[in-house]
Amino acid sequence: MKVITGGVTAAKGFQAASTAAGIKYQGRTDMAMVYSEKPCVAAGTFTTNIVKAAPVKWNQEIVYKHPSAQVIVCNSGIANACTGEEGFSYCRATAKAAAETLNVDENSVLVASTGVIGMQLPIEKLSDGVKAMAPKLKGTLEAGNEAAKAIMTTDTVEKEVAVEIEIGGKTVTIGGMCKGSGMIHPNMCTMLGFVTTDVCISKQLLQEALSQDVKDTYNMVSVDGDTSTNDTVLLLANGMAENPEINEKNEDYQKFCEALNYINTTLAKKIAGDGEGATALFEVKIIGAESKEQAVTLSKSVVTSSLTKAAIYGHDANWGRILCAMGYSGAQFDPEKVDLYFESKAGKIQIIENGVAVDYSEEEATKILSEEAVTAIADIKMGDCTATAWGCDLTYDYVKINADYRS
């Protein structure tokens, strides 16, 4: 596997465009379009929140009931959530505008929104934005990067990644972009992820690959414990790499899954590290677990703990907060067998052995916790299973950003 520069336009046949439609933000781009020269098999995973935004419902219809997709249109600023039938009609109107402009099937157009809940979209601006983007579609890396910028809300940086692998003697490329900074606790940010690939693969296996991978990537991220109404990951495969079709779980499928995991893990960590007001990526590894489920429950409990996140911001080795978060997680373990370590590029230090603090250097611990990426490793000594969750520290700026979000 080779990591390359790029995002959604890295794979063959994919183009992107962006525009400033003035939907809510002024003086910046706020709409993005991704287009494939050929129809794609599509896969998707969506929020588990009972309150689902209109675009989520629209995309579920397209992904699950139609054979192909070819376009993604995304706006930032307004979420189109809790907007009733009118909100759903705006999804249809957006798809219709894209279909007419690009000469594709209306049922091949996926739509996504992120922003403030409860506001209706200005449909004229949305339609005008679609028409403005279509002639600007390009397959350049710059076009993909600009699209990644257009879907940002409180994000501080665009998020994209791409890789190349070889399948059946052909070069296969996978690229992706995402946005997410606050309201991140997906269980399928607002968390939106768009991944494109030129691999030739069956629709069923594409969906299986994505559904399985999301469990270990995006679903292991928590910035603030809030599960958005709009969480969506879409994966399009147009087959233009011309590899032999992957239609069984063979070596080629595993190779594709490994590359997809790299894409999604990288994007998930970028979301966690760019949490609203964050100064550090906080990673929690549970090792020695009896089951995967136990490890997942424990790691997510720690990474979601506000007190632990505040301690990470203060570079404070307050291990009691970690043990406490593990204790109320609902997972069973023996606290008197837990070993705990902190690790960063500044080094690694043991804090607890068999549930009791060791004689460690507070100065050394603070040094390790002062880096931009910090890992807590808890060994519960019950088995061989592991899980890793990602989050960020909790800062004063998180409250400031969210107190002013609608203004």
Indicate residue ranges for each PLM-predicted region:
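A structural signal for small-residue-enriched, beta-sheet-centric alpha/beta enzyme cores
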Residues: 1-75, 79-89, 99-407
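Generic structural marker for isolated residues within well-ordered, non-membrane alpha-helices
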Residues: 95
